[in-house]
Amino acid sequence: MPAQLLDGNALSKKLRTEIAARSAIVTAKGTRPGLAVIVVGDNPASQVYVRNKVKACEDVGFHSVLERYTAELGEEELLARIATLNADPAIHGILVQLPLPEHIASERVLEAIAPEKDVDGFHVANAGALMVGQSEFKPCTPYGCMKILESIEYPIRSARAVIVGASNIVGKPMAMLLLQAGATVTICNSKTRDLAHHTKDADILVVATGKPKMISGDMVKNGAVVIDVGINRLPDGKLCGDVDFDTAKYVAGWITPVPGGVGPMTITMLLMNTLEAAEKAAKH
């Protein structure tokens, strides 16, 4: 029997209704949630992502600012712009779309964002706080994955979770969130020997490698929850994940589709983080 689909679009719609209601309440009290999105260069995927983020803001009643710059923008100019946004009381979240042009140091830029406005959760202060379970903001993609597990009331405590991919953006924070929820966690990377040995042992399998269809059905435990974070464009123009959906869906108990799984949830959790930043600002 095919796996149950974990529909990120449907879950996002439900959560965004809640976000819009809370946004209306905080706005009525004089603090409209505000998100500034900065994109440097003309990466086509980045343009699509920022457009989706700005539209999502509008849909839930947020104030949004989209700042587009050419790839020639200097690092110091970008840092100066971030400093201005840090000081702007109408802006509660600042997001710099990655990747940045090679002459700009991403780490320097991300560290320049005030931690209380770092709604992506990438600032080292927020990453460190996540490690000890006191994070201001959870990184949006892992946060979205946890919400997906929550939506099916999956018993995470004592479950064996395997994460394929050890990035700072997905793999490492995902491990922290699952650990805090009581799972036994294994992180696999490009040096891992006998990857299938680990993936076949996973009750919860999270894949974030950027390699199309690298996890096939024979690498999945029967009945597992499979969360596919990858989004890859094939030569024929079609999108696919890092999991071979067509074989994995006959083995897994639950699986996220690509597109329409984790992607919409990432944007929804960005909205949630921005809302929470605004609610916090309204109390001060």
Swiss-Prot record:
NADP(+) binds at G165, A166, S167, S190, I231. SUPFAM superfamilies: Aminoacid dehydrogenase-like, N-terminal domain, NAD(P)-binding Rossmann-fold domains. InterPro entries: Aminoacid_DH-like_N_sf (IPR046346), NAD(P)-bd_dom_sf (IPR036291), THF_DH/CycHdrlase (IPR000672), THF_DH/CycHdrlase_cat_dom (IPR020630), THF_DH/CycHdrlase_CS (IPR020867), THF_DH/CycHdrlase_NAD-bd_dom (IPR020631). One of its GO terms (molecular function) is methenyltetrahydrofolate cyclohydrolase activity. GO terms for biological process: L-histidine biosynthetic process; methionine biosynthetic process; purine nucleotide biosynthetic process; tetrahydrofolate interconversion. Keywords: Amino-acid biosynthesis, Histidine biosynthesis, Hydrolase, Methionine biosynthesis, Multifunctional enzyme, NADP, One-carbon metabolism, Oxidoreductase, Purine biosynthesis. Its EC number is 1.5.1.5, 3.5.4.9. Belongs to the tetrahydrofolate dehydrogenase/cyclohydrolase family. Catalyzes the oxidation of 5,10-methylenetetrahydrofolate to 5,10-methenyltetrahydrofolate and then the hydrolysis of 5,10-methenyltetrahydrofolate to 10-formyltetrahydrofolate. HAMAP family: THF_DHG_CYH (MF_01576). This is Bifunctional protein FolD.
